[in-house]
């Protein structure tokens, strides 16, 4: 049902507007179908619990007493069209499958990844028990420096401090680059995800950060 609603939101321009707001451009790849909900008939009202990672700015993040981000506003648009009440539940990426299986959340939305330590067979079994949407936005992890920085190569960062979020995907990506890791003086994990990392970089508290390309698009558009 949510997938059908997303097709309608793509057709009426809602997703395009959200993408421009958060990224400055629309690189989303949602299927578009203005009549996707027509065959579903009456849609019963319900409460929809969105499991989100609150450190994946600008997709989903803690904002004061609530949450904000592209995925959060997209979920709001989905529930508004379906007549559902939206609730949020903060979850860790590594626990997404458990949270879904236990019924604590109806959907894991915003930065969810399958456990990279799982075997291929284990991943396939998990996928068979979940309904997955097609990927709708390419989001890469990048090593980022300030525009006025003297650092221009990985080797030039030798002995410096690099910040990254607490989510395991950041450290896993960095650890996979052994040669690069050996150059750093310190790879420091901070709470607050990409948002906190960009704020520290702007303040000159570190030489570089590991952050999402979606966050870079937000800060540079």
Give the residues covered by each predicted segment.
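Solvent-exposed coil/turn segments that connect beta secondary-structure elements
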Residues: 23, 53-56, 93-94, 112-114, ...
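Extracytoplasmic small-molecule ligand-binding "clamshell" domains
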Residues: 1, 12, 17, 22, ...
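A ligand-binding cleft/hinge motif common to bilobed small-molecule-binding domains
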Residues: 95-101, 109-127, 173-178, 202-221
